Design a protein with these regions (language model features):
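N-terminal strand-loop element at the rim of the active site
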Residues: 4-10, 22-61, 222-227
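A short, active-site helix/loop in glycosyltransferases that binds the activated sugar's phosphate group
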Residues: 134-161
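A charged, aromatic-enriched C-terminal amphipathic alpha-helix characteristic of glycosyltransferases
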Residues: 11, 304-369
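Nucleotide-activated donor-binding/catalytic signature segment of Leloir-type glycosyltransferases, i.e.
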Residues: 228-247
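Short His-centered aromatic/hydrophobic patch
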Residues: 84-90, 108-109
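Nucleotide-sugar donor phosphate/pyrophosphate-binding loop at the beta->alpha transition
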Residues: 64-66, 103-105, 110-136, 171
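Boundary detector for helix-to-coil junctions that initiate low-complexity/charged tails
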Residues: 361-457
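Conserved donor-binding/catalytic core segment of Leloir-type glycosyltransferases
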Residues: 173, 177-210, 340
Length: 457
């Protein structure tokens, strides 16, 4: 069973579908547990796939009913092995795997380090639960060495628990024989804060390229919470472009463009399509991928490399002056490296004899689970207390609202009313979550377990 948060746009989503396609070719029966999104229809077309539309719990809660639902799915379909791809799935899927004694594979898709503390801020997982997740995994798959080392050091696990498998490309899907048109430029990115400077770097490079090539046209694929900011940047730079939003037909769009701007997976897909691939970077603009630097970029999942910063104008001139023979050499050499090192058929974690897989859950001590549960309750109590404090903050804002409203115009009044409604809704949601936990049958089971074992802990 493949567990993924939501079938929307993104590199992890594409990586999952690439993995699922390869498992399908190898004859596996695959169950996909993910919330519906525009990749769902494409997923349903893959042979041997049973798609289960499953909205996971809110990041701000631990939902015991979701745990029971995942447990029932595992038992109903006789699931033998679970692949967990995103942190959003962990609270319910890990718990269900422990209850059913089902082994699982944990994926570390982080292309950057330093994300684990951010995960703890979501509210549905404390440090002990986070540690348990990686400790109980049969294998941890990391996409690069830096991510593996960070995980290993943070959770104090042995190196043999890990395997590095980079995100790879399905060359049966991404291929092209059409000529390269250097007048057509494509920028691909999610519009989210974690992408940092990637989009603005791409826009600034195109601005320089347009000065040299008046025929250059820019198309942008992507969407997200920072869309308005991106649109403001486009307007500020006075760039004319076609914004297509989030799309699931990236291969066809790449076919129509000769230069691809982006990072990570989209850079690899551009190489597979034999296009000029330019890495925009998360921090600094990185420039063209060639046979001289492709291996260095591969170590960072085709993102920023040390001392890799390039000037926009310099790279724009480099691309503008490319001759046909130079273009052919670049794309052919890049393709050769990628096909050898990033082909999905050679880079997938397959367990041929699942019955013999190492399952640390078998060795999990019952009292250890209880200790972690108590720790999680303390964590949730602290987190909920913060929500209550925010509720008091909302009350204060309410008082300020009524005391100050006579001085406000209609626009400010409307903004304050919306802000107040958001605070009240969030506070009520927190109270509802606490009430759901209190009234659940799992809570009754937990109280009985704690009562029977409190003297043993």
């Amino acid at each position: 069973m493949i567990c993924h948060a939501r079938l929307t746009a993104g590199g992890i989503e594409t990586a999952c579908i690439t993995q699922i396609r390869e498992f399908s070719r190898r004859g596996y029966k695959i169950y996909v547990l993910a919330e519906n999104g525009f990749y769902a229809e494409k997923l349903k077309q893959i042979k041997g796939v049973t798609y289960i539309d499953f909205p996971y719990e809110s990041r701000a809660s631990y939902n015991l009913q979701k745990v029971e639902q995942v447990k029932e799915i595992i038992e109903k379909y006789n699931i033998k092995l679970v692949y967990i791809h995103q942190i959003d799935c962990v609270a319910s899927v890990l718990s269900a795997c422990i209850l059913t004694n089902t082994p699982y594979i944990a994926y570390v898709h982080h292309g950057i380090t330093g994300v684990y503390d951010d995960e703890l801020q979501m509210g549905n997982m404390g440090r002990n639960f986070q540690t348990l997740y990686y400790k109980m995994a049969s294998k941890i798959i990391a996409i690069q060495e830096a991510s593996k080392k960070e995980n290993m050091e943070r959770f104090k696990l042995e190196e043999n628990k890990y395997k590095i498998i980079p995100n790879c490309v399905d060359f049966l899907e991404f291929n092209s024989k059409s000529p390269i048109n250097l007048n057509k430029v494509l920028l691909i990115s999610r519009f989210e804060k974690d992408k940092k400077n990637g989009v603005i770097n791409g826009l600034r490079w195109f601005l320089e390229y347009k000065k040299l090539n008046s025929k250059a046209e820019l198309t942008i694929v992507g969407d997200g919470s920072q869309r308005q900011k991106v649109e403001e940047q486009i307007k500020e730079l006075k760039i004319e472009c076609h914004m297509l939003g989030a799309r699931n037909d990236i291969r066809d769009i790449m076919e129509q463009n000769g230069i691809i701007l982006g990072i990570a997976r989209c850079a690899q897909e551009a190489i597979a399509m034999k296009r000029i691939a330019i890495i925009t970077g998360n921090e600094d603009f990185q420039g063209i991928i060639t046979d001289d630097n492709i291996e260095k970029f591969s170590y960072t999942n085709f993102q920023d490399i040390k001392n890799g910063k390039k000037e926009y104008a310099e790279v724009a001139k480099q691309v503008y002056l490319l001759k046909n023979k130079d273009i052919g050499k670049i794309v052919d050499k890049n393709y050769e490296w990628l096909y050898t090192n990033r082909n999905i058929k050679d880079n997938i974690y397959e367990v041929e004899d699942i019955e013999k897989i190492n399952n640390p859950i078998n060795e999990l001590d019952r009292n250890e689970i209880l200790r972690i549960l108590i720790g999680e309750l303390q964590y949730m109590h602290t987190w909920m207390q913060k929500e209550i404090d925010r509720g008091w903050g909302a009350r204060q804002k309410t008082e300020d609202y009524y005391l100050g409203r006579e001085k406000w115009n209609n626009k400010v009044l409307k903004e304050k009313e919306q802000e107040l409604e958001q605070y009240i809704a969030k506070y009520n949601n927190a109270l509802n979550e606490l009430e759901n936990i209190k009234n659940s049958k799992f809570w009754e089971i937990y109280k009985k377990l704690f009562k029977n074992n409190k003297n043993k802990i």
